[in-house]
Amino acid sequence: MASSEQAEQPSQPSSSPGSENVVPREPLIATAVKFLQNSRVRQSPLATRRAFLKKKGLTDDEIDLAFQQSGTATEEPPSLGLATPVAPVQTPHLIAQPCSPGSSRWRDYGALAIIMAGIAFGFHQLYKKYLLPLILGGREDRKQLERMASSLSELSGSVAQTVTQVQTTLASVQELLRQQQQKVQELAHELAAAKATTSTNWILESQNINELKSEINSLKGLLLNRRQFPPSPSAPKIPSWQIPVKSPSPSSPAAVNHHSSSDISPVSNESTSSSPGKESHSPEGSTATYHLLGPQEEGEGVVDVKGQVRMEVQGEEEKREDKEEEEEEEEEDVSHVDEEDVLGVQREDRRGGDGQINEQVDKLRRPEGASNESERH
């Protein structure tokens, strides 16, 4: 019994170093020395003792050191022929049997704890490195996707608004372009019409100008022709006190003829008064005047007729100068006269000129007939 208790005592401390690696080796070596110094243990073979100590967690060096300290390294177990060593051989085995369940249990618990700790640490590392990023990444991805979806919806709304605005602006621009094109076409039509009207007006104006030029030239010619012929003079009026009283006599027709011949134009009178040759060649007319006035007043009648003719000639010259000035003013104003006025003036001048010429011709012819009749009588 004592040997079994001694065997259990070193087995308990030897189990502790196997379970705890932190405990120093000196106590284990001391317990192993005590275990080897036991008399019963000495009887067991060396290999069994070494195997037992190895089971307790000692290394080969520690086992050798324990054998050296115990002094049993050189001891040999007794021979196999003796019957006494059989029991001690079985005693270490019997001593080891009660110690194995406790140590193995603690060893299993420690190993299980270590394995669980390693598994937990591995799971923690896996969760930290792989699972957590996946979980957090999925959430962040979802948040980012939600943000992107909201931003895309906002962008789509803004794009739709901009598209509608662009469409409205394009429609307004197209309407403006259409209006501008219509205005341009209207302006082009107006320009074409204006060009056509201006061309026609230019042609008409050129024609009117040519007509006016031709009419002005004709007017100038007519005015020049009028200057060549004197204007129609008014019949000279004799005062009533100078008109002699007619006496019934056979020479009345001659007097009538001579009275009709007194209506000769002042041009003829002027020509007769200015040319003494004509006076010398027409003594018959002077005698006719003398017969009109009577034999008693011959000298006074001749004097009065000459003065009257001179006055009439002077008046006609003044009238002619006034008319020439008026004609010059009319020639200056002819360029400003309208077409109708020019035509009317032209027609009136033509009519007046022709009538005056005819009247002058008739009046010039009358005294010749009267003189012929007086010569016949």
From Swiss-Prot:
A GO molecular-function descriptor: protein transmembrane transporter activity
Record's function text: Component of the PEX13-PEX14 docking complex, a translocon channel that specifically mediates the import of peroxisomal cargo proteins bound to PEX5 receptor. The PEX13-PEX14 docking complex forms a large import pore which can be opened to a diameter of about 9 nm. Mechanistically, PEX5 receptor along with cargo proteins associates with the PEX14 subunit of the PEX13-PEX14 docking complex in the cytosol, leading to the insertion of the receptor into the organelle membrane with the concomitant translocation of the cargo into the peroxisome matrix.
Annotated Acidic residues bias: 323-342
Main location: membrane
Record-linked PANTHER family: PEROXISOMAL MEMBRANE PROTEIN PEX14
Segments on the Cytoplasmic side according to the record's topology features: 127-377
Subcellular location(s) per record: Peroxisome membrane
Residue ranges, compositional bias (Basic and acidic residues): 360-377
InterPro entries for this protein: PEX14 (IPR025655), Pex14_N (IPR006785), WH-like_DNA-bd_sf (IPR036388)
Region (Disordered): 1-23, 230-377
Keywords noted in UniProt: Acetylation, Membrane, Peroxisome, Phosphoprotein, Protein transport, Translocation, Transmembrane, Transmembrane helix, Transport
GO biological process: negative regulation of DNA-binding transcription factor activity; negative regulation of DNA-templated transcription; protein import into peroxisome matrix; protein import into peroxisome matrix, docking
Ranges annotated as spanning the membrane: 109-126
Pfam families tied to this protein: Pex14_N
Entry keyword annotation includes Transmembrane: yes
Protein origin, superkingdom: Eukaryota
Residues modified as Phosphoserine: S232, S282, S335
Name of the protein described by the UniProt record: Peroxisomal membrane protein PEX14
Residues the record lists as N6-acetyllysine modifications: K34
Modified residues (N-acetylalanine): A2
Source organism (scientific name): Cricetulus longicaudatus (Long-tailed dwarf hamster)
Sequence ranges on the Peroxisomal membrane side: 2-108
Start-end of Low complexity biased regions: 1-20, 244-259, 265-275
